[in-house]
Curated annotation (Swiss-Prot):
CDD domains: GT2_GlmU_N_bac (cd02540), LbH_GlmU_C (cd03353). This is Bifunctional protein GlmU. InterPro entries: Bifunctional_GlmU, GlmU-like, GlmU_C_LbH, Hexapep, Hexapep_transf_CS, NTP_transferase_dom, Nucleotide-diphossugar_trans, Trimer_LpxA-like_sf. It comes from Clostridium botulinum (strain Eklund 17B / Type B). It is an enzyme of class 2 (transferase). Mg(2+) binds at D103, N226. Residues 250-455 are annotated as: N-acetyltransferase. It catalyses: alpha-D-glucosamine 1-phosphate + acetyl-CoA = N-acetyl-alpha-D-glucosamine 1-phosphate + CoA + H(+); N-acetyl-alpha-D-glucosamine 1-phosphate + UTP + H(+) = UDP-N-acetyl-alpha-D-glucosamine + diphosphate. The active site is at H361 (proton acceptor). Pathway: Nucleotide-sugar biosynthesis; UDP-N-acetyl-alpha-D-glucosamine biosynthesis; N-acetyl-alpha-D-glucosamine 1-phosphate from alpha-D-glucosamine 6-phosphate (route II): step 2/2; Nucleotide-sugar biosynthesis; UDP-N-acetyl-alpha-D-glucosamine biosynthesis; UDP-N-acetyl-alpha-D-glucosamine from N-acetyl-alpha-D-glucosamine 1-phosphate: step 1/1; Bacterial outer membrane biogenesis; LPS lipid A biosynthesis. GO terms for biological process: cell morphogenesis; cell wall organization; lipid A biosynthetic process; peptidoglycan biosynthetic process; regulation of cell shape; UDP-N-acetylglucosamine biosynthetic process.
Length: 455
């Protein structure tokens, strides 16, 4: 049977108080609307249409990789009106359509599958995803007669008895496409809000003698984000889910409450994560690594048995058995080899560092290719920028760079070379050479007495 989905993403979200469309606010590193789309796809629904409105072009830009189609709701006149705006998407289709809110990032793949299966097996015209809550204030109520679903009543339109109902509408549904399409023209805005409610389709279908079903799920999954407080709540719930998944897969989190792992991050077994670490984007961390406290790693590949202390690594790769930090900064497009050492207060930018090379402290390397088993003394600087353009430095294998050396790019240093401490290198150093580029020391005898500075 054909299955498709509509995602309602047209609202600005006034309560969240932001210039950014509400559905583009991120939870665990991913836009809420993209959480919904990705979960839909995992549940086996490939054909999805996003109803856009406020910030339409930005929403399209942030979702274009998802290969979805779009319908425009130029004026926000309710959820029913939003689905009416997708009429062209629905027209002529047969099968089942699910309707989701773009601000519900916690919905699970298993719940979506269960909703579809229940709907199809029961041959319902509509199936509502619901939850039981202690305080349903603000939510639409599921009105039943026994187990039979009669209708959904929005909170502001509830009478005294309906307000006592604690089964709430999640705003996630399955519909028979043909019956939904036919019902959209029958919607009315004769209500307190003056809006067209999608929930009224339930009563329209029921009045026509069609079956209406419901699937009850955990309230946590149905949380819609309408404020910064709810955004933080969703973040906390999803963070706990992610951390639990990694621990179940063999990763040790010393303090899960202070460990932030983005939803797309991968971590190998027997890796140990200390408190106050942040892993973002498409980061992959290998097996048997140790990440000590206060590190941030984003969009990077960390191979096996790597130790990292209090460092920042962005869009880079770190080879097996390498140590990084404390207080190192690995900037984008850097590649650190195996068994290397990047020490304290070292900055690497857009550079390749060979296997076994040691850059132990207080060094800047930018736009450089460094060979294997080199050693950098404290205070080395690759001078790669002349104020207009950045230049490249190439350093061969087994080179020794003395302390306080300036390598003025563009420059090439051959294999098995030595550079004396305090040198400023401006021209090529050939293989096997020692380069000394500093002023000769001169001692002026009796200078302190002559100047009257002796104490």
């Amino acid at each position: 049977m054909y299955k498709c989905a509509l995602v309602l993403a047209a609202g600005q979200g006034k309560r969240i108080k932001s210039d950014l469309p509400k559905v583009l606010h991120k939870v665990c590193g991913k836009e809420m609307v993209n959480h919904v789309i990705d979960t839909i796809r995992k549940a086996g629904i490939q054909d999805a249409n996003i109803i856009i409105g406020k910030g339409a072009e930005l929403v399209k830009e942030r979702t274009e990789e998802k290969k979805v189609t779009y319908s425009l709701q130029s004026e926000q006149l309710g959820t029913g009106h939003a689905v009416q705006c997708a009429s062209e998407f629905l027209k002529g289709k047969k099968g089942t359509v699910a309707v989701f809110a773009g601000d519900t990032p916690l919905i699970k793949e298993s719940t979506i599958k269960n909703l579809f299966n229940t709907h199809i097996e029961a041959k319902n015209a509509a199936t509502i995803l619901t939850a039981i809550v202690d305080d349903p204030t603000g939510y639409g109520r599921i009105i039943r007669s026994g187990n039979e679903v009669l209708k959904i009543v929005e909170h502001k339109d509830c009478n005294e008895e309906e307000l006592k109902v604690n089964e709430m509408n999640s705003a996630i549904y399955c519909f028979d496409i043909k019956l939904l399409y036919e019902s959209l023209s029958k919607l009315s805005n004769n209500n307190e809000q003056g809006e067209y409610y999608l929930t009224d389709v339930i009563e329209i279908l029921k009045s026509a003698g069609h079956n209406i079903g419901a699937v009850v799920t955990d309230f946590e999954e149905t949380i819609g984000v309408n404020s910064r407080a709810q955004l933080a709540q969703a973040e906390e719930i999803l963070k706990d889910r992610i951390n639990l998944k990694h621990m179940e897969n063999g990763v040790t989190l010393i303090d899960p409450k202070t460990t932030y792992i983005g939803i797309d991050v991968e971590i190998g077994k027997d890796t140990i994560i200390y408190p106050n670490n942040i892993f973002e984007g498409n980061t992959i961390i290998g097996e048997r690594c140790t990440i000590y406290q206060n590190s941030r790693i984003k969009d990077s590949i960390i191979k096996d048995e790597v130790d990292i202390q209090s460092s920042v690594i962005l869009d880079s790769s770190i080879g097996n058995n390498t140590t990084v930090g404390p207080f190192a900064y690995i900037r984008p497009e850097s590649k650190i080899g195996e068994k290397a050492r990047i020490g304290d207060f070292v900055e690497i930018k857009k550079s390749i560092i060979g296997d076994g090379t040691k850059v132990s402290h207080l060094t800047y390397i930018g736009d450089a290719e460094v060979g294997k088993e080199c050693n950098f003394g404290c205070g080395t600087v690759v001078v790669n920028y002349d104020g207009k353009k950045k230049y490249k430095t190439i350093i061969g294998n087994h080179s020794f760079i003395g302390c306080n050396t300036n390598l003025v790019s563009p420059v090439q240093v051959g294999d098995n070379t030595y550079i004396a401490a305090g040198s400023t290198i401006t021209s090529e150093v050939q293989e096997g050479d020692l380069a000394v580029a500093r002023a000769k020391q001169r001692n002026i005898k009796g200078w302190v007495d002559k100047k009257g500075l002796k104490k």
